[in-house]
């Protein structure tokens, strides 16, 4: 499921597949004072609803949680109302992992680079590795060296410029996971935050 945390200023969505954690926070404007709430929503239903609303209108949507109005969001329901339609979904009665404990509050190294160049390089070097094998990124001296492979199939290597702060570091990623993350960033550059090569990195 997708965890939705709501207060009177922001809505935060969090989801995980046990290997990756995605978090998105955006502002909203409630009609009335809103007490802090956290619910778990079926991910497939919420994703389908978002796609349907986005395809039919660009107008803002309304959220309704709890209360007695079954049409908008009765007890145990989340209501979503758009310009031309409305829908409700039943909430899940389950616990979501305490995801904020997985997000480091500080970093020992930070790297910023061009998204298009990085994505293209990852796609090229990963051709030399087996499906699901990792791509290694070595950061140092204003550049990052991407490598993959190294067995009988050969090895691929590419170098890209990077704005890097921290000690030299090599970290390995599943290329598909990185490409998925890069594909949803609405910018031309991406910043990675590291604590050391082993714990998860933040994009």
Question: What are the roles of these predicted feature ranges?
Answer:
Residues 1-25, 31-92, 106-203:
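DNA polymerase processivity clamps
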Residues 101-104:
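Basic, Lys/Arg-rich DNA-contacting stretches centered on the C-terminal catalytic core
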């Amino acid at each position: 499921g997708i965890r939705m945390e709501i207060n009177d200023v922001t809505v935060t969505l969090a989801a995980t597949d046990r290997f990756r954690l995605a978090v998105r926070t955006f502002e909203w404007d409630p009609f009335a004072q809103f007490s802090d709430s956290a619910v778990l929503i079926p991910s497939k239903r919420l994703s389908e609803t978002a796609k349907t609303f986005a395809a039919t209108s660009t107008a803002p949507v309304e959220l309704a949680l709890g209360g007695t109005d079954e049409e908008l969001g009765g007890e145990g329901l989340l209501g979503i109302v758009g310009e031309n339609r409305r829908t409700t979904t039943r909430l899940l009665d389950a616990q979501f992992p305490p995801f904020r404990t997985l997000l480091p509050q500080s970093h020992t190294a930070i790297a910023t680079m061009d998204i298009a160049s990085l994505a293209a390089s990852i796609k090229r070097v990963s051709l030399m590795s087996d499906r699901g094998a990792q791509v290694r990124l070595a950061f140092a001296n204003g550049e990052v060296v991407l490598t993959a492979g190294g067995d009988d199939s050969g090895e691929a290597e590419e170098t890209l410029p990077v704005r890097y702060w921290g000690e030299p570091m090599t970290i390995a990623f599943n290329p598909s996971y990185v490409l998925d993350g890069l594909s949803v960033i609405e910018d031309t550059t991406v910043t990675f935050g590291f604590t050391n090569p082993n714990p998860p990195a933040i994009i």
